[in-house]
Amino acid sequence: MFLAQPRGFCAGVVRAIEIVERALEKYGPPVYVRHEIVHNKYVVESLKAKGAIFVEELSEVPPKAVTVFSAHGVARSIEEEAAARDLPVLNATCPLVTKVHNQGKRYTSKGRTLILIGHAGHPEVEGTMGQVPGPVLLVQNLDDVAALTLPPETPVAYITQTTLSVDDTKDIIVALSKKFHDIEGPDTRDICYATQNRQSAVRQMSKLVDLILVVGANNSSNSNRLREIGTEAGIPSYLIADGSELDPAWLDGKKAVGITAGASAPEVLVDDVIEALRRIVPVTVSVLPGREENIEFVLPAELATA
C-alpha cells in the first residue's frame, strides 16, 4: 500500500477549523458557521459536538451571535447583511480564495470583462462572483468558451476556482486566448499550491498502483477531482468517506493500493481506511516521496492570542 504525499489538510483548511475551535474557546458555544466550514462530514460533526451550529443563511443566526464565514468565501451581500445586523464575524475564507477575489477586482477596475473558470453552484464560485463588482462570466468547459458571445476585441481577464489546478484549466485558458485578442490572467504560480501538489502526487502514485482510494466527501470538489485523475490514468479509483465505505470486491486481483485524501479530509480518516484494509488483507504501508508543505496562514487578530 502506498500513501500519496502530500495528502489531506491544506493550510486554508487548518486555519478555518482552528478559527472555529478558538472562537468556541474564547466566546463559548454556540458559535454559528455559515455553510460547512470545509466540505467534510467528520470535521463538521466534530465541531458540532464542541458547540458549533452550521447554517446556510444568516437569517438563521440569532442577534449578536458570533458568526464564522466558511473557508470557501462569501459574496459582498453576505458581508453587508452581517454588518447590517451587527453580527460579530470571524472570516475563515482561505487567503488564497481572497487572493482570487482581489485579482478579479483588479481586472475589472481596469475595465476588463471578467471570466471565472469554475464549477457552477460551488460555494467558492458563488462567493467570488459576489465579491467582484460588475458581471462575471462563468465557464466550466470548452463548450462554455465557444458559447461566449463577446466580440474578439473585448478586453477580458480570467481567474480560476482554487480547487482547479493548472492542468485542469490549461485547455480552457488556451481556448480563451485564441478567442480573445486582449486577455490577461494570473501567473500560474498564483494557483492554489495544495490543489496542484495533491493532483501531481496522485498522477505519480498512479504509476505504481492498480487501485486508488481517495478519502474525502462527495461534495468536496478537490476530492472528486483526485478520483477523476486516477480514473483518467486508467486506474480503478473510488472516493470514500471512511473505512466503512470500502468494498472488499475492489481488492480482487489487486496487488498495490494507493491512498490519498482531499484537502478537507483529516488524517484520522486515512488511518480508518488503512485499518479497514488490514481487516481484509495483510498490509504494508509505504509513504511516497512528495513535495513538502510548510505553509501556515495567520489567524484573525481577534483570535491570535486566544
Curated annotation (Swiss-Prot):
Gene behind the chain: ispH1
Alphabetized Gene3D superfamilies for the sequence: 3.40.50.11270, 4-hydroxy-3-methylbut-2-enyl diphosphate reductase, catalytic domain
Active-site residues, Swiss-Prot/TrEMBL: E124
Chain positions recorded as (2E)-4-hydroxy-3-methylbut-2-enyl diphosphate binding sites: H39, H72, H122, T162, S220, S221, N222, S264
Binding site for isopentenyl diphosphate: H39, H72, H122, S220, S221, N222, S264
Cofactor note: Binds 1 [4Fe-4S] cluster per subunit.
Cofactors demanded by this protein: [4Fe-4S] cluster
Name under which the protein is recorded: 4-hydroxy-3-methylbut-2-enyl diphosphate reductase 1
Residues where dimethylallyl diphosphate binds: H39, H72, H122, S220, S221, N222, S264
Pathway participation: Isoprenoid biosynthesis; dimethylallyl diphosphate biosynthesis; dimethylallyl diphosphate from (2E)-4-hydroxy-3-methylbutenyl diphosphate: step 1/1; Isoprenoid biosynthesis; isopentenyl diphosphate biosynthesis via DXP pathway; isopentenyl diphosphate from 1-deoxy-D-xylulose 5-phosphate: step 6/6
Single GO term (MF): metal ion binding
One Pfam family in the UniProt entry: LYTB
